[in-house]
Amino acid sequence: LEIPDSGKIILNDKVINNESIFVQPEQRDCDLVFQDFSLFPNMTINENIHFGKNAPRNKSMIDELISLTNISDLLSRYPHQISGGQQQRAALVRALANNPLLLLMDEPLSNLDSELKENVRRELISILKKLEMTVLIVTHDAEDALTISDKTVVLKKGKLVQLDTPK
C-alpha cells in the first residue's frame, strides 16, 4: 500500500512496486487479511464476503470456502455479533474469494486466545494446503511461523537474516 524507499516487489515476473512504479492495489492480484480482520461493521458476513472484486465470478469457490471454514450459519450476522475466530475465518474467505496469486496476512492469529488460536491455526493450515496458495504471513510468534509455513524468512531492520524450511 506504500511506495517503497528502496527495493521492489515482483509478482509473476512483473514489477508491481518500486521507487518509480506503483501499481494500484486493486490491480495487483493479491489480497490482504489485516490483523484486526477489517470487516465492514455495517455489512453482514455474507455481504463482507461478496464485497471483493472477483466475488461475483467465484460463487462456487466462495460456497466451498464457506463450507471449509464452517461459517455458513454466520452469513446473516454482523461482525460484532460473532467471535474473533469467526471474524478471522470470514476475513479469510473474503480475501480468498478474489482468488489472488498472493495472499498477505498480517498477524492473523494475534487477536485470538490460546485455545481458539490453536483451532484456527489448524484450520488455516488445512485450508491453505488444500488451495495450494502462496501466502506471506507477518508474525512475531515463532510457533505460528514454524507451524503454518513451508518456508520462514527472518528480517531485521528490513534486511534478510535467515531463510529456512521449518522441520
Regions found by a protein language model. Name each.
Residues 78-82, 86-88:
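Conserved ABC ATPase signature
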Residues 103-107:
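Catalytic Walker B motif of ABC-type/P-loop ATPase nucleotide-binding domains
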Residues 14, 57-76, 125-132:
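Conserved ABC ATPase "signature" region
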Residues 16-31:
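ABC ATPase NBD coupling module
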